[in-house]
């Protein structure tokens, strides 16, 4: 046998072994009789993500749509079988009823290379997650939200004044509400004045944008963190961008240290982090700062995008805007002309509008869990093996015509009492559900509602000739946000409404 023959035989053998490996791994769902996305060699179902053709949000939505009328669908993360669930009843089992078997997320970071990123509530697993979440949960209790209310309302009123000062010119609400939510979040959760609304060069704004900037390399990092944690042992990657992490860690460390020195109690996240250090004597500095980083990152994008999407839809639907403004005026009139915590809770149409915004534009486009023990899907013969990743496309679920007819239409009436009662509750989960839902959802909702209230009291929001219709979502980000600028017009509706008092 010549060297060439030996080489060709070796190649043939390797290709044969590769074919056997691929066939064995990619027959998992077929052998179970589960409807699945046809895999491709080596990459499984991940080709569109690997070629940057779509964002993770659109990728998972595509898997959801491929399920058709099936309650779930299998796919492959490279050679690893994964399952996407679209049936609300099964989701209720996974997220709530059988939560003990699905407590962990797949999302991870390498604790040796990225100790802060790996230590946040989104990534930590098992009993440690329970311990830290229990210490942080009271940050968002009703009592504390009432204290935070005035801070959030003040930030919303400053935003209104900023718009009024700009006069008759279009405002890019995408940028505006990033600054608004950043100032509100820093003040409300950390006791820090970030001063970004009037200062485009503010450091918190600069590093916030840097943290969320989406590049091809960051896309690959996201692929590892959210879909294939095994790759974290190969690549030197971080959940949060390095330079912004360094700046924010220093800022949050200073805030915590200063609060510990003064003993000042502000009923915010900093107080909860100090309490965390006292309650868990073995808690690390990385775990404390990891929570601060998580809340900053989550609040920076999700809340601001919800505000921008809300204003965009209200500009496109003036009849909805007028009805909402009327409700705001009537409720505030019953509360002495003031915007109060109790008054906001009585604004039922506002709640319907915000619910529809979050249906059409869910803050998190998908959620994930990991099956901790073999799990028999109720009512079937299918068993999900231990270690199988489970995904839910919130974007796909909320825009599924089976649950929401004409899903691209903006229609708050979907959430009136009559229609809401006729829809499975787990077909609408913008913040997830169960014990591992979004811990800050009540603060996020309050922030969005107060901005809407303060702006609609004084201003009419309208489209501009440069406003994109229809809206294009960015294919390059993890959280939902529009592609490019989002200019809208704000027209004062009368001086009598501008001076509404705060409470």
From Swiss-Prot:
Cellular compartments per GO CC: endoplasmic reticulum membrane
First and last residue of the signal peptide: none
Cofactor(s) essential for the protein: heme
Main location: endoplasmic reticulum
Recorded GO MF terms: heme binding; iron ion binding; monooxygenase activity; oxidoreductase activity, acting on paired donors, with incorporation or reduction of molecular oxygen
Pfam entry (one): p450
Expression tissues: Detected only in testes and accessory glands of male adults.
Record EC number: 1.14.-.-
Origin superkingdom: Eukaryota
Residues bound to heme: 438
Keyword terms, alphabetized: Endoplasmic reticulum, Heme, Iron, Membrane, Metal-binding, Microsome, Monooxygenase, Oxidoreductase
Membrane topology: Peripheral membrane protein
Family in the record: Belongs to the cytochrome P450 family.
Name under which the protein is recorded: Cytochrome P450 6l1
Provenance organism: Blattella germanica (German cockroach)
């Amino acid at each position: 046998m010549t060297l060439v023959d030996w080489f060709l035989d070796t190649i043939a053998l390797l290709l044969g072994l590769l074919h056997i490996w691929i066939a064995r791994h990619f027959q998992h769902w077929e052998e179970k009789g589960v409807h699945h996305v046809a895999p491709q060699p080596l990459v499984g179902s991940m080709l569109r993500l690997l070629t940057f053709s779509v964002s993770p949000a659109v990728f998972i939505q595509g898997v959801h749509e491929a399920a058709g009328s099936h309650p779930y669908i299998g796919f492959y993360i490279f050679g690893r079988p994964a399952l996407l669930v679209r049936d609300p009843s099964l989701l209720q089992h996974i997220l709530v009823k059988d939560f003990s078997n699905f407590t962990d997320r797949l999302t991870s970071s390498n604790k040796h290379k990225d100790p802060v990123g790996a230590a946040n509530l989104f990534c930590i697993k098992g009993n440690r997650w329970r311990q830290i979440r229990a210490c942080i949960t009271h940050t968002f209790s009703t009592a504390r939200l009432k204290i935070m209310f005035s801070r959030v309302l003040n930030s919303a009123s400053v935003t209104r004044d900023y718009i009024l000062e700009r006069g008759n010119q279009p405002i890019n609400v995408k940028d505006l509400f990033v600054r608004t939510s950043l100032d509100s979040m820093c003040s409300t959760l950390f006791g820090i004045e970030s001063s970004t609304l009037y200062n485009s060069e503010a450091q918190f704004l600069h590093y916030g944008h840097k943290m969320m900037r989406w590049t091809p390399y960051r896309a690959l990092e996201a692929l590892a963190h959210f879909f294939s944690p095994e790759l974290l042992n190969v690549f030197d990657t971080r959940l949060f961008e390095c330079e912004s992490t360094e700046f924010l860690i220093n800022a949050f460390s200073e805030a915590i240290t200063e609060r510990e020195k003064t003993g000042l109690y502000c009923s915010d996240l900093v107080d909860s982090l100090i309490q965390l250090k006292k309650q868990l004597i073995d808690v690390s500095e990385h775990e404390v700062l990891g929570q601060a980083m998580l809340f900053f990152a989550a609040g920076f994008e999700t809340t601001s995008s919800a505000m921008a999407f809300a204003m965009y839809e209200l500009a496109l639907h003036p009849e909805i805007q007028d009805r909402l403004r009327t409700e705001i005026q009537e409720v505030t009139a019953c509360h002495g002309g003031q915007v109060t915590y109790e008054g906001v809770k009585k604004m039922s149409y506002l709640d319907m509008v915000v619910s529809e915004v979050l249906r059409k534009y869910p803050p998190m486009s998908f959620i994930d869990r990991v099956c901790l023990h073999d799990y028999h899907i109720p009512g079937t013969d299918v068993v999900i093996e231990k270690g199988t990743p489970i995904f839910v496309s919130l974007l796909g679920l909320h825009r599924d015509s089976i649950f929401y007819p004409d899903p691209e239409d903006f229609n708050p009436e979907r959430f009136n009492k009559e229609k809401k009662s006729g829809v499975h509750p787990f077909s609408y989960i913008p913040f997830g559900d169960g014990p591992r839902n979004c811990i800050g959802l009540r603060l996020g909702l309050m922030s969005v509602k107060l901005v809407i209230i303060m702006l609609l009291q004084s201003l009419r929001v309208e489209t501009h000739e440069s406003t994109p219709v229809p809206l294009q979502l960015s294919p390059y980000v993890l959280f939902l946000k529009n592609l490019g600028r989002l200019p809208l017009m704000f027209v004062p509706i009368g001086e009598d409404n501008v001076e509404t008092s705060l409470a």
